[in-house]
Amino acid sequence: MTASTAAAVVASLGLAVGAAGCVSFYEIPVEIPLQAKIDVSQFQRVLVFGFLAGGSNAIDPNTETARLLRSQLRSKQDLKVIDSDVVSLVDEVDRRQAAAGAMAPAPAGGPLVKGEPKIKTDKDLQNYQAIFSDKEFWKAIGERYQSPLIITGSVLFSEMTKSGMVSKPQQYVDSTGQTRYQEVHEWADLKGYALDSKFIFIDGRTGEQLYTEPLHEESLYPATQNTPALSSYFELMDKVLPSFLNTLSTQKIRGTRILIK
């Protein structure tokens, strides 16, 4: 059956139903479960260890992300969240390099300015990512904290600018004197932030990776609007959290369905 034929059939049915009597439509709430991406039944504890973090120096993505995830895990699932200091994996890798007599990875953009993060781009990040494959390191961390599920990864919170078409409502008065609104498009300069996060879930008993969740979100605002970096960070994390939480536990998507009566 073609799309046009199907449409004709639906239209005919609608006429038949209408001829038989009045048709009413109503919405009912529905919940669709999304199954957890990994089985965490063998764990009693979860450790948000710390992250490879960088991008902008407007906030500390490592500390902010660890605190936020711990808070969410305490309220949204049953594993005991371990209280511990948030570890900077950038500093951990640099200590290893120094102990081995090697130079710390150099930023891709040239010499590092004091106060600037060591990781600004994906290329900088690649110089540090080998730590995630070090099973013995993560196994040792697991032994220290009684074999928990370990959550780590990378978080880049970066400033960005763009130019493009944006839409906005425009007020006008019609021929009858009524005030109305219409959507207009215009060229605008935008600025904001991008959040590139990769959450890595590690078995603290073996040091092996169980699952990796890469996520990208961005928020853009008019260039004349002053939006605090921390506010934008939390706005972006609000978009990321549902997918993160769904890794560990079944989540429900709420919506509505229209029925004909």
Predicted regions and their residues:
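N-terminal segment of the mature soluble domain
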Residues: 45-159, 204, 208, 212, ...
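C-terminal/domain-edge helix-coil "capping" segments
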Residues: 22-44, 144-145, 157-261
